[in-house]
Amino acid sequence: MRQIMIAVAIAVAVSILLTPALIRLFTKQGFGHQIREDGPPSHHSKRGTPSMGGVAILAGIWAGYFGTHLAGLAFDGEGITASGLLVLGLATSLGGVGFLDDLIKLRRSRNLGLNKTAKTVGQITSAVLFAVLVLQFRNPAGLAPASAELSYVREIATVTLTPALFVLFCVLVVSAWSNAVNFTDGLDGLAAGCMAMVTGAYVLITFWQDHNACVTAPGLGCYNVRDPLDLALIAAATAGACIGFLWWNAAPAKIFMGDTGSLALGGIIAGLSVTSRTEILAVVLGALFVAEITSVVLQILTFRTTGRRVFRMAPFHHHFELVGWAETTVIIRFWLLTAITCGLGVALFYGEWLAAIGA
C-alpha cells in the first residue's frame, strides 16, 4: 500500500506542476485547439485552448511508476516487471500516435490530424507488438504477463485463443479502448475524471490479486496473475496523473489532453484488462467509455442504412448538450455513472472471489 500511495503522490505532483508549464508553452507557440464548425455552439468559445496536455499525463504516469521503484530501493520494494513495462509501453506507443495527430492538427490549424489509415496503422502496430510480447517473459512459476484464455475475473478455461486469434483479439481490445476514451474526451474534464475512477478501481482489483496470488497464497480463489502489484502501481500512477491534470482540465478547461492523452489512457485500460485477466470485467468498469463509442457506431450504421440519425450528434455526450443540458451537468452526471459502474465492477470482482472460496 505504501508503494501505491507514493505512485499516486508523485504522479499528481508531476502532472499538476507540469501542466501549467505546458499551457504557457503551447500558448506561446500558438498551439490552440481547433473546434468543429458543426459542434455545439457553446464550444466555439473554446477555440484556441492549448491541447496536447496528454504529455503531462504520460509524464506523470512515467514519473509515478519509475519514481516509486526508485523509492522502493530504500525499503526493499519489488523491482520493475515485464507486465508493468508492457502496459506502460503500450500506452506510450499509443500516446506517440496521438502526439503526431495533435501536432498535425495544431501545425495546420485544422481539426483533422493524421488520416484514418495512418492513425489505424499506428494503433494496430502498437497492439500487435503488445500482443506478441505479452505472451513472452514467463517468470519462474511459468506465468506470462497475459494468458491466451479469455477472461472475466480470471481465465475462462473453456475459451482458449490460438496465437493468431489472440493477436487479433488484442488488436480489437486496444483499438476499441483507445478510440472509446478518445471519443469520450469531448467535454472539459470528462475523460480525465472517468479515467481516474476506472484506474482507481483497477488499483483495488490488482492489489487484491496481489494479496491472493496463487504463487504466494495458494488456495481457493487465488489468482494466476503475474506481477499484480506492479500493475497496481501503473493504475495508481495513472489515477494520480489524471487527478493532477484534472486540476487544470476541469471546466472551464485551461488545456485539453488531446489525442496524446486519450489514446494513451485507452491503452492503459486495454493493457490492464489483458494483464490482470479482466477483459470482460473492464467493460463494466469502463461502461461510460463503451457507451460513448457505441453511440458513434450506432450513429454511423443507422445513418448509412436508413439516412436517419439516432442522436442529434455523436458521441452522445454532445446529444445531451444539444437537447439543453449544460456542459457541467453532462460531465457530473457521467462522472456519477462511472462511479456507479466502477463500484459495480469491483463488487462483481469481489463477489466472484467469495463464490470461489465458497463463502
Curated annotation (Swiss-Prot):
Signal peptide positions on this chain: none
Catalytic activity, EC: 2.7.8.13
Source organism superkingdom: Bacteria
Pathway recorded for this protein: Cell wall biogenesis; peptidoglycan biosynthesis
Membrane-topology descriptor: Multi-pass membrane protein
Cofactor(s) it depends on: Mg(2+)
Pfam family, one: Glycos_transf_4
Swiss-Prot/TrEMBL catalytic activity: UDP-N-acetyl-alpha-D-muramoyl-L-alanyl-gamma-D-glutamyl-meso-2,6-diaminopimeloyl-D-alanyl-D-alanine + di-trans,octa-cis-undecaprenyl phosphate = di-trans,octa-cis-undecaprenyl diphospho-N-acetyl-alpha-D-muramoyl-L-alanyl-D-glutamyl-meso-2,6-diaminopimeloyl-D-alanyl-D-alanine + UMP
GO cellular component terms attached to this protein's record: plasma membrane
HAMAP family in the record: MraY (MF_00038)
Physiological role: Catalyzes the initial step of the lipid cycle reactions in the biosynthesis of the cell wall peptidoglycan: transfers peptidoglycan precursor phospho-MurNAc-pentapeptide from UDP-MurNAc-pentapeptide onto the lipid carrier undecaprenyl phosphate, yielding undecaprenyl-pyrophosphoryl-MurNAc-pentapeptide, known as lipid I.
Protein's name according to its UniProt entry: Phospho-N-acetylmuramoyl-pentapeptide-transferase
